[in-house]
Amino acid sequence: MEPMVERFVRYTSINTRSNEESTTIPSTQTQVDFATNVLVPDLKAIGLDEVIYNRENGFVIGTLNANTDAKAPSIGFIAHMDTADYNAENIKPRIIENYDGNDICLNEEHQIFTRRTDFPNLKNYIGKSLVVTDGLTLLGGDDKAGICEIMEALSYLVAHPEIKHGKIMCAFGPDEEIGTGADHFDVKQFPVDFAYTIDGESLGQLEYETFNAAGGTVTLKGVSVHTGTAKGIMINCAKLAMQFDALLPGAAVPEHTCGRQGFLMLMSMETQVDTGKMNYIIRDHDKELFEAKKAFFLQAGQTLNEIYGREVCEVSVKDQYYNMYDIIKDNMECVNVAKAAMEKAGITPICDPIRGGTDGSKISFMGIPTPNIFTGVENLHGRHEFACIDDMKKAVEVIVNIVNIEK
C-alpha cells in the first residue's frame, strides 16, 4: 500500500468526531489525542523544521523553511481534524481498485449499497481506485484526505530539495464541522502571505466565494391551560412555530435553491404547549441580500407578535461567517497561483461559489486570504462518502506546484 493511502486508511480509522454541545477547545478529547499522538509525531518524522501543538486552540502547526534565497511568498495549507455529526465509531475503510462503474455494495449483511441512480457522480470514477465505508459510518475523508495530501506534499518536498520554495506552513485544526475551530485560529503563529484550505470535494474545485452566514433563534412563549377550558386562552407553541415558518418565503429553502441563491432553513424545532424553540440558518452570497434575509427573519417575529397582540416569540440573529470573496477579490494572487498549479497538473479549475463555508472564510477576514482546493472526496457526511485515490494524488501534485517557485 502506498504511503499516502496507508496514512489515509490509518487516519480515517480514528474517531475524531466533534461535538457542538461541548464547551471545551477542542470539543472532543479524541481530537486532542489525534493531534498530539498522531499528527505531531508524523509531521516530525517527515522532517519539518518546526512542529508545535497549541493547547489553547487545538491547532497543530508545522513549518518547512524556505530552501532558496530567491523571492518567494510564504504559503500555508490548512485542513481540519474533526469529522461531521455522523457515526464515526469503528470506521472500516475499504479500497476498491479499478472501480467498474456498477453499484457499490458497502455492506452485504445489511444490504447497504451506494447506487448509481442515487449518486450519478460515480460515473466520473470508472477505472479509478476508491476508498469507501462499510455502510455503518462515515469515512472521514472530510477532511483527513486534506491532512494526508498536505503531509504527502511536505514529505515529497523534503525528499526533493531540488524543488525550490519559500516558507511553507501547515495547520491542522479542530471543530471545523461545528463552526468554531477557526474562531480561535492564531494568525500570529501562522505568518504567511496567503493560504489554502484543502477541504474541497471533486477534482478541480477551486473555491473563493462562500456564503455569508448567520444563525437565527426563535424562542416561543405560549399559554398552557386545560383543553376543556382553553377557548380564547391557550396559545400553543407548536402552532406558533408553524405560523412563524409560514411567514418566511417558502421558495427560499435549500431544496429549491442553487448557485448563488440564498435561503433560510429551519434546522431544528422543539415545542411543548407553552414553550418552544426553533433554530434556523440564514445564507446568501450577496451581502445586501444577506442583510435583507436577516431583516425579513426579524420582521417575521414582529409580525407574529402583532397578530397575537402580545409577545409570543423572541427572535435573535447572530452572524457566523462572511463571504471570503470580499477579501480575496483584492488579493487574487492566491487564486491565480492555484489556477496555474492545477493547469500544470492537467486539471481544469472549477471555480463555482461554495454553498457553505470553510475555515478559510473566517481566516480570510483575519488577514490571510484563504481559498479552498479539492481533496478528491465526495458524498460527504454520511455512509456513502468515498475518496478517490487518483484524485488525492492530483491534489498532492497541485500543492507541490503551488509552492514550486519555478512555475
Predicted features along the sequence, with ranges:
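Metal-dependent amide/peptide-bond hydrolase catalytic core
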Residues: 238-407
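Glycine/charged-rich beta-loop-alpha catalytic/anionic-binding loops adjacent to active sites
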Residues: 123-137, 221-225, 345, 377-381
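Short, conserved micro-motifs enriched in small and acidic residues
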Residues: 29, 33, 137-148, 231-239, ...
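Phosphate/diphosphate-binding glycine-rich loops and adjacent basic-rich segments that engage nucleotide
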Residues: 197-223, 227-230, 234-240
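Active-site metal-coordination/substrate-binding segment of hydrolases
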Residues: 70-167, 172, 394
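Acidic/histidine-rich catalytic neighborhood of metal-dependent amide-processing enzymes
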Residues: 123-210, 251-267, 271, 277-285, ...
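N-terminal helical capping/dimerization or prosegment-like subdomains
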Residues: 1-58, 64-86
